[in-house]
């Protein structure tokens, strides 16, 4: 493993300016693109949403890496595997958040971003890559949703 030392990292203002130039500007897609018309003409069933089941929570935690870096919640997957009594409460709260997303607690989507130096001049912002540690609860909720979308896509959208 090559260790790259950041002797003089860029300032917070330089970092924010750089990333806003890449991600901060809204862009418009071509609404008349041919692929959009083709997709609109396809007869695809809609994905019906069913409440998250406790079995999905338990299954997710059983496959999660025990000591992955947690976000602001500081919850390690190990404890969620070891304390199955929490799964019922997590299930209830996830379903409440899906029903009323505006009531989701701010900490759920908060992350800690670390700027990892790649190579080159450590003063240059472009020579860093951001790594964001999201909360364990956020990763769990989005992981369950992603699995459902993947299953739906495999069963309903992809050709047989």
PLM region spans:
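Basic/polar low-complexity segments
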Residues: 1-52
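Conserved pre-catalytic core of RNA-dependent polymerases
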Residues: 28, 35-36, 40-160
């Amino acid at each position: 493993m090559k260790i790259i030392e950041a002797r003089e990292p860029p300032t917070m203002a330089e970092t924010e300016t750089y990333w806003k130039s890449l991600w901060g500007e809204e862009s418009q897609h071509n609404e008349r693109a041919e692929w959009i018309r083709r997709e609109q003409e396809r007869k695809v069933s809609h994905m019906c949403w069913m409440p998250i089941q406790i079995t999905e929570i338990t299954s997710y935690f059983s496959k999660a890496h025990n000591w992955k870096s947690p976000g602001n919640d500081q919850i390690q997957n190990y404890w969620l595997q070891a304390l199955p009594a929490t799964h019922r409460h997590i299930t209830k709260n996830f379903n409440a958040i899906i029903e009323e997303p505006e009531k989701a607690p701010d900490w759920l989507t908060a992350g800690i971003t670390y700027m990892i130096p790649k190579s080159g001049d450590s003063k240059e912002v472009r020579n860093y890559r951001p790594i964001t540690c999201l909360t364990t609860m956020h990763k769990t909720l989005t992981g369950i949703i992603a699995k459902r979308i993947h299953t739906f896509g495999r069963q309903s959208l992809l050709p047989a």
